[in-house]
Swiss-Prot record:
With S4 and S5 plays an important role in translational accuracy. Interacts with and stabilizes bases of the 16S rRNA that are involved in tRNA selection in the A site and with the mRNA backbone. Located at the interface of the 30S and 50S subunits, it traverses the body of the 30S subunit contacting proteins on the other side and probably holding the rRNA structure together. The combined cluster of proteins S8, S12 and S17 appears to hold together the shoulder and platform of the 30S subunit. It comes from Xanthobacter autotrophicus (strain ATCC BAA-1158 / Py2). SUPFAM superfamilies: Nucleic acid-binding proteins. The modification 3-methylthioaspartic acid is found at residue 89. One of its GO terms (biological process) is translation. NCBIfam families: rpsL_bact. GO terms for cellular component: small ribosomal subunit. One of its GO terms (molecular function) is tRNA binding. Part of the 30S ribosomal subunit. Contacts proteins S8 and S17. May interact with IF1 in the 30S initiation complex. Keywords: Methylation, Ribonucleoprotein, Ribosomal protein, RNA-binding, rRNA-binding, tRNA-binding. Residues 1-31 are annotated as: Disordered. It comes from the Bacteria. This is Small ribosomal subunit protein uS12.
Length: 123
């Protein structure tokens, strides 16, 4: 515990807020190329094979992005768009890949929340 005199000499420094998605560099989205597409397992109470991709961004950052929705067409060298947003049960996954943008196809047979999955309106 500092004395009042010590605080007068050197006041307390406010803690800087940490950026949750540093690779975006204050952009809403960034484009990148998939370097590896694979599945991984979530943290403890959950169990699944979550689809993720390692993406090399245009600013030469390399990040892991989650592929949402059922089924996807991504492979190595696919050009994708990422947005911020972590996946709570996948450590190290701090970005989402946008569906229906660039090389990523939208989710087939999606009826609700279509805009989140790049699905067109069914006829």
């Amino acid at each position: 515990m500092p004395t009042i005199n010590q605080l007068i000499r050197k006041p307390r420094e406010a803690q800087k807020a940490r950026d949750k998605a540093p690779a975006l560099q204050a952009s809403p989205q960034k484009r990148g190329v998939c370097t590896r597409v694979y599945t991984t397992t979530p943290k403890k109470p959950n169990s699944a094979l979550r689809k993720v991709a390692k993406v090399r961004l245009t600013n030469s950052y390399e990040v892991i992005g989650y592929i949402p929705g059922e089924g996807h067409n991504l492979q190595e060298h696919s050009v994708v768009m990422i947005r911020g947003g972590r996946v709570k049960d996948l450590p190290g996954v701090r970005y989402h890949i946008l569906r229906g943008v660039l090389d990523t196809q939208g989710v087939k047979n999606r009826k609700q929340r279509r805009s989140k999955y790049g699905a067109k309106r069914p006829k």
